[in-house]
C-alpha cells in the first residue's frame, strides 16, 4: 500500500523530555530533539503525533507544538489520554488510525522506544522506523522485542527513507 502519512512519537523523538520533566507541559520550555526543526518541514506527507501522555490531551499538546513552532505541521494529534489506551496496546493504534482516517499500510510510525512504539506498531501491522540514536533500549538488552521495519540513527535519515519508499 502507498504511504499517505507519517506518525511520530513525542518524547525523545520530537521533544527532549530529559530536561524539565517535572514542569507542567503548558509552561515547560521547548527543547526539540536534533533534526526536528530541520527535517519535519521538508517531509512530503501529512504528519501525525501519536503520544503516550500522563494527563495531556490533544489541546495541551497542540499548544506545546505551537510554542515549538511545529503546530501547523501536524494534521493529527493523538494522545493516550484521548485514546483511552497507551502504546503498545492495540487499542491505542486502532484509535489513532480511525481518528486519522488511515489504514495500517498507509502510515509509517517513527519512535525511539522498542518496547512501546516499535513493538506496538509492529504487532498492529504498522510499518515502523526506530530512531535508534536516542533509544533507551537495544536489541542486546531485550532480544525478544519486536524488530522495526526500518532503523535510522537520527531524524536526518528520514527524508531519504521516505524518498526510497515512494519510488
Residue ranges of each PLM-predicted region?
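Conserved phosphoryl-transfer catalytic core
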Residues: 21-26
Amino acid at each position: 500500500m502507498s504511504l499517505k502519512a507519517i506518525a511520530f512519537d513525542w518524547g525523545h523523538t520530537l521533544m527532549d523530555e530529559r530536561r524539565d520533566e517535572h514542569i507542567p507541559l503548558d509552561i515547560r520550555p521547548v527543547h526539540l530533539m536534533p533534526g526536528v526543526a530541520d527535517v519535519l518541514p521538508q517531509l512530503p506527507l501529512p504528519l501525525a503525533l501519536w503520544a503516550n501522555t500522563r494527563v495531556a490531551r490533544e489541546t495541551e499538546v497542540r499548544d506545546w507544538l505551537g510554542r515549538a513552532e511545529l503546530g501547523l505541521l501536524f494534521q493529527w494529534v493523538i494522545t493516550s489520554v484521548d485514546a483511552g489506551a497507551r502504546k503498545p496496546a492495540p487499542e491505542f493504534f486502532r484509535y489513532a488510525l480511525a481518528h486519522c482516517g488511515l489504514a495500517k499500510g498507509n502510515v509509517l510510525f517513527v519512535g525511539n522506544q522498542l518496547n512501546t512504539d516499535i513493538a506496538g506498531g509492529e504487532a498492529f501491522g504498522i510499518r515502523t522506523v526506530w530512531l535508534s540514536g536516542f533509544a533507551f533500549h537495544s536489541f542486546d538488552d531485550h532480544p525478544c522485542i519486536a524488530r522495526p521495519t526500518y532503523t535510522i540513527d537520527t531524524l536526518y535519515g528520514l527524508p531519504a527513507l521516505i524518498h526510497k519508499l515512494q519510488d
